[in-house]
Design a protein with these regions (language model features):
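A structural feature that tracks compact, well-ordered secondary-structure segments
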Residues: 38-43, 84-92
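Short acidic, hydrophobic short linear motifs in intrinsically disordered regions
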Residues: 45-69
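Short amphipathic alpha-helical interaction segments
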Residues: 68-87
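Positively charged, polyanion-binding regions of nucleic-acid-associated proteins
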Residues: 27-48
Length: 99
């Protein structure tokens, strides 16, 4: 059992109510989660990063308004994704701050 691996499953033809992340309310949040996972894939397990590095990565890889950080809604969606990632043990906070 490797705790650093994530299992991806095939999406069924008909989505069921139990599928998905209940804390997410938009497709953009799933896109941010995928971007976060892609960003982390290129880093060592204990390597630290700052939020601006992640947002620069997302901006470079996601076109359009979804990566416009001047929009409050985009910042809130990213924070929701980061909170989920912390709850799941995907990332940790080392700066003493909270999301």
């Amino acid at each position: 059992d490797n705790s650093l691996l994530i299992k991806m499953e095939k999406i069924p033809v008909i989505p069921e109510s139990f599928m998905g992340i209940m804390k997410f309310s938009s497709k953009e949040e799933y896109a941010y989660l995928c971007m976060l996972l892609m960003y982390l894939e290129d880093r060592d397990a204990q390597e630290q990063f700052i939020l601006s590095q992640l947002t620069e990565y997302i901006t470079a890889n996601l076109p359009g308004d979804i990566s416009d950080w001047t929009l409050y809604t985009n910042r809130r969606k990213l924070i929701r994704v980061l909170r989920f990632a912390v709850e799941q043990g995907i990332v940790g906070i080392t700066d003493g701050g909270t999301l």
